[in-house]
Amino acid sequence: MTDRSDPAEVKILTDSLDALGVKNIRMPAPRGPRGGPSQCHDITVYPSAGLAAGACSGYGLLLNIKDPLHPVRLQAVADSNFSFWHSATFSNDASKLLYTDEWGGGTQPKCRATDPIDWGADAIFTLRNGKLNHVGYFKMPAAQTETENCVAHNGGLIPVPGRDIMVQGWYQGGVSVFDFTNPAHPKEIAYFDRGPIDASKLVIGGYWAGYYYNGYIYGSEIARGLDVFKLTPTADLTQNEIDAANLVRFNSLNPQMQPKLVWPAAFPVARAYVDQLVRDNGLPASRTTAITNALRSAEKLSGTARAAALKTLAGQLDRDASGASDAARVRALATVVRGLESAK
């Protein structure tokens, strides 16, 4: 270049450049601490609890959002078994928090019999006084094939009173419904699995998510369209529990703006609690039978006669709670019965 101020006066040099010999090349020394991921894949907010959970690729965040304009970071958690922290779900009482690991970005088969149970799974934490404590994992239990992309993905709560139940999509692993009321021992209680799209080769597809909404489960299947399911009773989920869940209605639902689930004072809710006491031996069989009969009799009454019968039953339940192995559930049942007593 003959004149730097005039780009038109440029000459091309055709001679080659000489490379100088350089020895002992060293990487520059770091100029500060190494940073981690600087953004979150998903953030689930739970306004009624004043909390938010960020799934932030390499770790999970817990935030206090009681003042939404000034959120406070409470804790960050990591797990060497996790590849990609993807999404989060709170239990309804905010005593538990579940994070998903989308190992391989949802495009790999990670549910084979040879895959560890804690890879591409859900990590479950207890949450107390703003602190998380890891207690368990959940992974859909049915082994999948080499031609099925499968990993934990999106889902949400099913509003069964007294229990923490979630429905979740696992890509070609299907839709899984599981109970994490005991966070150290989660258990699958229902599932739907179409099988591989192509048994001879991996074709990406499966359930991106499973969500419960007003009595139905909606599964968005990437390759095969939308599936709609209804729950059916089993030993792990009674018709009374399903009926109680169906009483919770939404006008709209944003799964990442988690709503507080509230049940009306209704006989199906009371019977759901009784079924749980029977299943878990929370009261002697003689008492659960008597409570069932008392509820049936009260439901046939009306006005002051019904209120009097329910008041008597509530008092009996208060006494039952003092010696019950599941006192909290008995007290919850008593609260529902008192709500029925005062209902018009």
What kind of feature is each model-predicted range?
Residues 1-277, 293:
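Feature marking well-ordered beta-strand scaffolds used for ligand recognition
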